[in-house]
Structure formats: C-alpha cells, structure tokens
A protein has these predicted regions:
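N-terminal Rossmann-like FAD-binding beta1-loop-alpha1 element of flavoenzymes
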Residues: 1-17, 156, 162-172
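Glycine-rich flavin
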Residues: 6-150, 183-187
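Rossmann-like NAD(P)H-binding beta-loop-alpha module
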Residues: 148-190
Length: 191
C-alpha cells in the first residue's frame, strides 16, 4: 500500500493512505523485520555458545530479553517514522483509522466520506486462532513480538516456516521449546 501510494503520488496522483495500525504493515511491524532482529540475536547466542569449540575463552553473563525487545521496538519505530516522512515528502495524506466502502468510488471513515476514481486495497493478513478449548491461553505469531518477558518454556504449534523460525529463536535464546506438528515432520510443504 505505501509503495503504491508513493509511486502514484510521484506520477502526480492525489493520494491518501488509511492505516489503522502502525505504518509499514505486517512485514515491518510483526513479520519479516522484527523476526530478523530476533533471528540475528538467536544466531549471535548460538555463535557465543559454540565459541569455545574454536579456541575462544569467553564467558556469557546472561541474556536480557527486555533489552533486546526495547532495541528491536525502537528500530521498528524508527522505520515507522521513515515511512511517515516519505509519505509527507511525497504529499501522500496519512489518515489513522479504518474505512468501509459505500460504493465503488466512495469510502467512509469516522463519518467522513472520501471519493476516488481508484482505490488500492492492501490489507495485509491476520493470524487465525483455532476455535478449540484453551485457545485463549495461547498467542499468535504477532503476540511473540509483544512478549515482555522471555518464557522459560513454550509449545509452538505449527509446522510451517513461521512456527519453525520462532521455535528456533526461542531455543537459541534459552527457552525450552516443544514444537507440535500435525503431520509427521515440520516444513513438510517446503522439503
């Protein structure tokens, strides 16, 4: 959505972006980018743990989940700011909230109507929570990035790449992990 609005504005179109959450979408806020920060921390932890196998005499004095979360969140906020500045620079109006279609050329948000010849819909995705007993005690992959404390133990349910990546991050940073899969192995659609 942001790239489309910025590109259209660069060609002279009058554009607006309506966003109910933080700018940048799923990838920047609760997907690719924060996951890569966590994955890099996990890889660093793994390297430190195996350093003695390569002749290094180091001691590891612990890991601070809160510090990593704080730095990761600050990095994401910086990216949100960059996106806001780019919209402003390109004269794309940023409207906080969500809208509904009235007809093919009209949307409404908070009682105000906006008309346009064309709309680009880039809604992103949301995790689906199963309708099973106890589901309220779990978190989605989005919730992983909201954890204020590092859990001592987790059960990650899923066999796809997101579940396997998050299980790997937890494990490398010292959390005891159980990966629960429906089939006979993880990443079955990727092997």
């Amino acid at each position: 959505g942001l790239a489309g609005a910025n590109r259209a504005a660069s060609y002279g179109a009058k554009c607006a972006v309506i966003e109910q959450a933080r700018l940048g979408g799923t990838c920047v806020n609760v997907g690719c980018v924060p996951k890569k920060v966590m994955w890099f921390a996990a890889a660093t932890a793994d390297t430190l743990q195996s350093a003695q196998n390569y002749g290094f005499d180091i001691s590891i004095n612990g890991f601070n989940w809160n510090e990593l979360k704080h730095k990761r969140d600050a990095y994401i906020e910086r990216l949100n700011g960059i996106y806001a500045n780019n919209l402003n620079k390109n004269k794309v109006e940023h409207i906080q909230g969500s809208a509904s279609f009235i007809d093919a050329h009209t949307i409404e948000m908070a009682g105000k109507r906006y008309t346009a010849e064309r709309f680009l819909i880039a809604t992103g995705g949301q995790p689906s929570i199963p309708n099973i007993p106890g589901a309220q005690f779990g978190i989605s992959s989005d919730g992983f990035f909201e954890l204020e404390q590092q859990p001592k133990k987790v059960a990650v349910i899923g066999a796809g790449f997101i579940a396997v990546e998050l299980a790997g991050v937890f494990q490398a940073l010292g959390t005891q992990v159980s990966l629960i899969v429906r089939g006979d192995h993880a990443l079955r659609q990727f092997d």
